[in-house]
Structure formats: C-alpha cells, structure tokens
Amino acid sequence: MSLKLPRNWDFNLKVEAAKIARSRSVMTGEQMAAFHPSSTPNPLERPIKMGWLKKQRSIVKNWQQRYFVLRAQQLYYYKDEEDTKPQGCMYLPGCTIKEIATNPEEAGKFVFEIIPASWDQNRMGQDSYVLMASSQAEMEEWVKFLRRVAGTPCGVFGQRLDETVAYEQKFGPHLVPILVEKCAEFILEHGRNEEGIFRLPGQDNLVKQLRDAFDAGERPSFDRDTDVHTVASLLKLYLRDLPEPVVPWSQYEGFLLCGQLTNADEAKAQQELMKQLSILPRDNYSLLSYICRFLHEIQLNCAVNKMSVDNLATVIGVNLIRSKVEDPAVIMRGTPQIQRVMTMMIRDHEVLFPKSKDIPLSPPAQKNDPKKAPVARSSVGWDATEDLRISRTDSFSSMTSDSDTTSPTGQQPSDAFPEDSSKVPREKPGDWKMQSRKRTQTLPNRKCFLTSAFQGANSSKMEIFKNEFWSPSSEAKAGEGHRRTMSQDLRQLSDSQRTSTYDNVPSLPGSPGEEASALSSQACDSKGDTLASPNSETGPGKKNSGEEEIDSLQRMVQELRKEIETQKQMYEEQIKNLEKENYDVWAKVVRLNEELEKEKKKSAALEISLRNMERSREDVEKRNKALEEEVKEFVKSMKEPKTEA
C-alpha cells in the first residue's frame, strides 16, 4: 500500500515558526508564564499606575476593555478590576513606546503602541500592544510612565540627566542641559517683569511643538514673539519628565527632613541641607545650583512679577523634589517640607552653592590611575571620551572595559620603550578629553588581544574583590592560584614570538633570539622579573597550551563577572523589597493614626451629643414637674366650687 502526499504541502519551517509565534501572541497570562519567568505579579510591589484602557486584539483587530496595572518592570492586564490572575503581561525594559497619529475621521481615539525589544520578540514571539486611552491627557500620562519604566531613549525629554549632559559635551562644555540654558536665558531676558511667571500655563500646542523639536535633535531658537509662559512651561515639563528627579529618590527623605528642621532650628537645617547637597551626583548638583540662582534672579523683581521666593518654591519645588511613589497622600504630606527647603535653597544659594564648585573637575592624570594602563601613541585602539563623573556602577563597568584599552602587544608603554619614554611627548588631559573616537592603526591579531585583555582583567578582578560589599566565591580563589602560571605562559609566549604591528612582514633568520633578549632586558628593567634564557625556544605544543590557558582564564574572569553581577542584582532586589516593606509599614502606621484621629473625633462628638441629651432630659423633667403642679392646681380649683355648692 502506498501513501500519497498532497501536492500543495509546504515544508518550509518559516511558516510553522510564524504560526507558533502567532499562537504565542494570544496566550493567556498563565501560559505566558512559561516563556517569561517574572510574569506573576508580586503583591508586595506597589503599582506605579493602573487604569482602564482598550486593547486591540492581534487577529480580529477589535477593541477590548481591560484593566491595566503597571508594576515594577511588567505591564499586566486583567479582565476586571477585582481579578487577581492576569490575562497577560509584557516585559517593558528595552521596549519602544510611541504615539500613533489617527485620521481626522477617527477623532476621539487616543492610540499608542508598545513595541517589544527585538531580542524579546524573537524569543517569545510576542506582537506589539496597541492600546487606546479615553483622553489625550490619560494617554500622555501612560506614555510617560511606560517610557520611564522601559528606559528607552526618547530624545531630550525623558532622558536621564547624566546621559544628556554627557551627550551635549560634544557641543562644548555645559554644566547643565542646553534646553535649560536656552529657557533660562530667554526668561531672564523677556520674563522678569511678566506677572505670574511659572504660575500661569503656556500654550499646550506650542509646548508640544517645542518638545518634539528638541526630541528630534533640533535646537530651536526662541524669537521675540515666543510666549514667555510657554517657555516656562517647557522648562517645567523637562524637569517633570526626567526619569529620576534632580533630587534622587534615595535622598528624598533627607531633603524632607531638612524642611522639617527649618521650623525648629534653621541653622541645623542648613547644615543638614549642605550634607545632602554634598552627596548629590555632580550633574544633579550643577543643575540644582543653576536653577536656584536663576530663580533668585527672577524673585528680585517680585514687586512686578508677583512671584516671591515662597511662590517660586511652591511652583518649582515639586518638579525638582518628588517621591518615587506618585501617591496623592504622599505628595500632599511632603509638599510643605519641599516648599520650605526650596525656599532655603533659593534664598541662601550663595552659601549652599558657592561658585567655586561650578568649575568642572579635570580628569585625573593617567600615571595616577592604577586601574587603567596608558595607551601609547603608537598603539592600536580608539581614543575614547572620558566621563567627568565616575559613579560606583560606572567604575565597575570601566573595569570590564579596561582590558580593551591596554597595549595590543600585551605590554605597558613603559615596557615597550623604557629608554625613550622620557623623550616621547605626552598629551595633556585636556587634549584627549574632548576628542571623538578615532581609529589610529590597524587591529591587532587575536593572540595580542587576549594577552592584553587578560592583564586588564586580572587587575580589574583584584579591584572588584577589594570591595567589602561583594563576597568572593571559590572561583575567585582559583583565579588567584593561576596567576603565576599565567605569567610564566606570557614569558614563554614573549620569548617565542614578539608580535609586531606589521605581522605580514617576514622576520630575519636571526631576529627571534635578539628580540627575545631585548624583551627580557626591558621586562627586567621595568618590573624586576627574571626571565628564562633567550636561547631557549618553545615548541608549537607549548604555544597552544598557553593560548588554551589564556582562554580558560578569560572564561573564568567572565564567569566571575557574571556571578558578581547576579549577586549585585540579588542584593538590589532585596534592598528594594525591604524599602517597599518599610514603605508599606509606614503607610499602615499613617493610616492607623488617621483612623485613630477619626475615632477620637467621633468619641468627642458622641460625648457632646450625650451631654446635650442629658441636658434636654433634665429640661423635660423640669417641664413635667411644672405640668404636674399645674394639673394639681387645676384639679383643686375644680373641686373647690363643688364643695361650696
């Protein structure tokens, strides 16, 4: 018996993959949990935003009303507000959120789209989410929160402050973003005498046009006809749309404490505020200092513009200092303290923000930096722009990239040129500070790259383990034990072959021994190491073993970095959970205190009503007695005529 297959069968795997992807896109929340490990919502995490939106189905393209909850880095949607089991979720980091322009015929539809990251889309087969809000304001609010969680660059607005400042350094030295400078200069020129500046709103359509222009990379100039209130609204919008406010969330409670201390002891409050300002990131400090001086200039004309220090602090303070949890109760609780501390910063800006601190820090000299090997002018590589401020996470990332900036021959510049190093002119930090990335020579071969990468990785590993916050693992000890073996292999490699930039030029017959002897003498002068005899040569087997040892140690370093990163993430998650638990306990205490106050007021009201009832009862008893006496007298008066008759 023979089996005949249909002629129109298609064995193309792409079609099947597309079907699988489409089937995954319509999975429920329970099924999607198998593809994404964190699809189950954590009840301890406080929702960032929640509300009703309409979701477009992927196949039928009709709209469904769903209840969306933005929690941590996930967007969940439920069929009903009371449901505890989500119908689906979406992992937001790396996603793109964009507004969709509708036709004039579809007026009243405010649609935006969430496009997943390319890696997440390929792994999960998940389509984009097309959502519709009920109003323009609601859509803009959802887009703002989603972009903040997604962490995607969205132009100047919504971009991190340090990223904006670092990017704009190529246009010249700027302590604050260019947008802030432009707005402040325009307001100082045309808005000092404008009544209600920063209090009266600008034109929404013009603000949106200017925002889109800045996000598109343009630098629009404000002409004389530009409404000054529109420019002020644009400045407030930029400050409000920062992913993290100018005062970081970690220092929010510290600034509130300064505001509380102003009522009791203003001198102590000023000292505490100076401590908080000293630990601000440099970009945040520069922007806060610039804004406070700018607002001080505005309030000098308060007799005309009606904006005193207190009024400016009330209007601008909530944009500079805000809580991570945008709860109305939390905002109302912190508003008076924010207003007081902002007033102090504007009034005492000369003391709190001395102009001596405005000078940008010059990058440290290369010879004083033990973490980074200097790059010789004749070496192969790219000149990288240096960052002015190095945070804890930036220093860790710079450790991982230091291996790429070492000399491609596996040597330090002082080792390669020990005699002529003093004659070679060195560049000043200011010369290479603002240079763009440029390629100087051809790329080295793989062996040289591995050698240089290992030297950088070995030093970075020691720097990482010096930190007491991370506990070293057993693999770290193993890496320490291999250090001597690695140095021996490097000596063997350097003895056997000295890598030249021009690898395609054949060397002379007697050159290997001479180069090895020169290399050994240079290494002895610089490091004090005793190398093997220059006449000893190594075979191909030893070269391969040395390369394998380098590869294995490279893998070990990578594994250690991954382990440290996972430990760091785990500790950060624990810290976040503890902060959330602390906040929940604090919120519960506040709620209980409010309920206690309400009960006290109730009991006081009941006591008053009880007293009133007692007084009314006494009055009624008195009236009853009076009526009884009147009745008795009336009865007596009725009996007396009868007796007389």
Swiss-Prot record:
In this chain the PH domain maps to 46-151
Q: Where is the composition biased (Basic and acidic residues)?
A: 420-431
Region (Disordered) residue ranges read 355-444, 469-550
Q: Which InterPro entries match?
A: PH-like_dom_sf (IPR011993), PH_domain (IPR001849), Rho_GTPase_activation_prot (IPR008936), RhoGAP (IPR051025), RhoGAP_dom (IPR000198)
| A GO biological process held by the record | signal transduction
The record's keywords, sorted A to Z, are: Coiled coil, GTPase activation, Phosphoprotein
Q: Which residues carry this modification: Phosphothreonine?
A: 406
Q: Which residues carry this modification: Phosphoserine?
A: 362, 395, 536
Per the record, where is site Arginine finger?
A: 199
Which Gene3D superfamilies did the record assign? Answer: Pleckstrin-homology domain (PH domain)/Phosphotyrosine-binding domain (PTB), Rho GTPase activation protein
For this chain, one GO molecular function annotation is:
GTPase activator activity
- Show the PROSITE patterns listed in the entry: PH_DOMAIN, RHOGAP
CDD domains, alphabetically? PH_RhoGap25-like (cd13263), RhoGAP_ARHGAP22_24_25 (cd04390)
- Can you tell which superkingdom this protein's organism belongs to? Eukaryota
Residue ranges of coiled coil: 541-644
Q: What does this protein do?
A: GTPase activator for the Rho-type GTPases by converting them to an inactive GDP-bound state.
Q: Write down what this protein is called.
A: Rho GTPase-activating protein 25
